[in-house]
């Protein structure tokens, strides 16, 4: 299987290389693709030194699958060019997510929707992926009516410049500013750009992508997204109102039996998910599971995951695995 990684020199691209090596995909040839300024750069993969190539060269090589993590503009321009030579694209940007002709995939939830006709497949936003991993099994049984979300998001979701800003500020140095304010010892309620409705783009991604993945746009969803000075992963406080009655013990059991989910929930031993322990792992961790005392048919969850792995690289590679095993 010939696979191209577009955006191989970026933060997510680096993690994707790690995940590809860990999960042992049947790769006969790996093409590392990046912008012109990175062409010729050498990157190690499984003991071999590979040279970065340009987009034109990669298209000419006609890979079976192209994993895109190079931003929306690159995806909009180049994904159709790869598709035209028979390549199946899995795109990690927001470029194709809400296109009604493209599927938005979390393999554990809706991977079975994929067919050989799907040449451009969208990977959801990081904060959406970890949340729907919890919501999907609950929605099937209890029918979700409304969701209230507050996210506490890692600076790695912004990129290398944000990590550099935090490190500089922690050391008292001046330097690049990825955010309009200091991030060290701060919380910024501003993820992505503000929209006309005064929500941020990140907040509305949670709304629209959740509707699409779960196949139900009747549920009410509102979100507040906050950037905090951590690097291990995203955390979410999620309040879920159901249409059907439930028992907390059944909620715990259902989540415990969900593939890709790890329940960490024992107040007596101070056991609950935290990004410092989620970092580097592919599971979605759920804890603080409790009935909403203000509403008889609602539950509160605390959901944590590594945004660069399950929130990006791992989910992308899992889609590729599904395609290789069932479609291509």
Describe each region flagged by the PLM:
Residues 66, 155-328:
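Charged docking surfaces used in two-component/phosphorelay signaling
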Residues 1-183, 218-220, 284-285, 289-295, ...:
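N-terminal Rossmann-like NAD(P) cofactor-binding subdomain of oxidoreductases
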């Amino acid at each position: 299987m010939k696979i191209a990684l577009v955006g191989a020199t970026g933060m997510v691209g680096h993690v994707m290389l790690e995940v590809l090596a860990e999960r042992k995909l049947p790769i006969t040839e790996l093409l590392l693709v990046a912008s012109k300024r990175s062409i010729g750069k050498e990157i190690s993969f499984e003991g071999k030194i590979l040279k970065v190539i340009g987009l034109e060269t990669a298209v000419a090589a006609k890979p079976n699958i192209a994993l895109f993590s190079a931003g929306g503009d690159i995806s909009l321009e180049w994904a159709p060019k790869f598709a035209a030579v028979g390549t199946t694209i899995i795109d990690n940007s927001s470029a194709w997510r809400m296109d009604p002709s493209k599927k938005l995939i979390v393999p554990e939830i809706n991977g079975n929707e994929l067919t050989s006709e799907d040449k451009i497949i969208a990977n959801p936003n990081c904060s959406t992926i970890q949340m729907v991993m919890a919501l999907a099994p609950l929605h099937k049984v209890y029918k979700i009516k409304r969701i209230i979300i507050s996210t506490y998001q890692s600076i790695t979701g912004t990129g290398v410049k944000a990590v550099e800003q935090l490190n500089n500020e922690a050391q008292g140095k001046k330097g690049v500013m990825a955010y309009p304010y200091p991030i060290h010892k701060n919380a910024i309620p501003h993820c992505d750009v503000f929209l006309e409705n005064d929500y941020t783009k990140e907040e509305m991604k949670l709304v629209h992508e959740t509707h699409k993945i779960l196949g139900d746009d009747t549920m009410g969803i509102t979100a507040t997204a906050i950037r905090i000075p951590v690097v291990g992963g995203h955390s979410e406080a999620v309040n879920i109102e159901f249409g059907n009655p439930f028992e907390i013990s059944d909620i715990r059991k259902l989540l415990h039996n969900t593939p890709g989910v790890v329940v960490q929930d024992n107040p007596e031993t101070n056991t609950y998910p935290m990004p410092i322990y989620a970092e580097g792992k592919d599971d979605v961790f759920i804890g603080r599971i409790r009935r909403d005392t203000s509403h008889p048919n609602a539950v509160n969850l605390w959901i944590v995951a590594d945004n660069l792995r399950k929130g990006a690289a791992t989910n992308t590679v899992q889609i590729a695995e599904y395609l290789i095993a069932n479609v291509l």
